[in-house]
Amino acid sequence: MKIRIPDQKKAKNLEKIKWFFITAIFITSFFINNFFDKIGYFTRISIITLLVVFAISIALYTKKVKNVFVYINASKNEMKKITWPQYKETLYTTFIIISVTILISLLLWGLDSIIFRLIAFIISVRF
């Protein structure tokens, strides 16, 4: 079923109104916390919590949040399709990486020592 153009404009305007109310609610909760410090702490926190819950409940019906939930579900389905390596394969791969790292570091250390001694020899012969 295709949505007609006036319905699309109406839906777009409704989204804008929802986001305006969400923003207004969060700004109101900020002002309540900062400017009504004479009110008791528990009362202030209760009001702010109710406002935040109300803003979140409005946000759950916006198109962007619905798209986020669709993306999360698609990600979960993709995670199920992945073939994860077994513990033994992971352990062997880790040992190979550690061994190659140690081997390369020893080769570089040896090459550095040879170059250092060669340069020291050249400098000592020259002077």
From Swiss-Prot:
GO terms (BP aspect): intracellular protein transmembrane transport; protein secretion; protein targeting; protein transport by the Sec complex
InterPro entries assigned: SecE_bac, SecE_sf, Translocase_SecE/Sec61-g
Subcellular localization(s) per the UniProt record: Cell inner membrane
GO cellular component, one term: plasma membrane
Residue stretches spanning the membrane: 17-37, 39-59, 95-115
MF-aspect GO terms: protein transmembrane transporter activity
Biological role: Essential subunit of the Sec protein translocation channel SecYEG. Clamps together the 2 halves of SecY. May contact the channel plug during translocation.
Classification via PANTHER family: PROTEIN TRANSLOCASE SUBUNIT SECE (PTHR33910:SF1)
Subunit-structure text: Component of the Sec protein translocase complex. Heterotrimer consisting of SecY, SecE and SecG subunits. The heterotrimers can form oligomers, although 1 heterotrimer is thought to be able to translocate proteins. Interacts with the ribosome. Interacts with SecDF, and other proteins may be involved. Interacts with SecA.
Protein name: Protein translocase subunit SecE
